[in-house]
């Protein structure tokens, strides 16, 4: 290492049981996002191992881990392609981990499924499949991102302060949707938040990190 090198995370020993909804809270610089980035494969780890459902993913590149992990970021613009239609974004999410050809057409059964899932949001988007994602509000886009991240029922759902950029009312709606989807699919979830009230309200486990 170098003289300016700083250890971001050390001595982390975390085990999540299937269906655990674990909230993580801590101040700036505590390593919350670093923890999620390490699990997702964005940052390599120097020692130890990361296992998802008995599969060692420690050396697995980020794009391969995406098969097991769903993730929603803080920025509502990150999780969706703004220049593509709602239906095209949903197709990409539906076919994650599969070979994508040049055909964008989807089956009637897929369209019915998309409408059914979008109806859960209560935003009227089930009738706007051809709308361009970039024309939607931040809350609408984040709701769709959450839907996309949970569509294939990932082994692990990572939520990186996914309501921090939203206004209070929209943030509450997205949190309620999160709770509903996690419960519906019994998803093992790790959610970072700065809000102690939210950390206590949601999930069955709470982790506090300090810098």
Where are these regions (language model features)?
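Conserved ABC transporter NBD signature motif
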Residues: 48-56
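Helix-to-loop junction immediately C-terminal to a conserved catalytic motif
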Residues: 40
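The feature captures the beta-strand-to-loop junction immediately N-terminal to the Walker
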Residues: 25-27
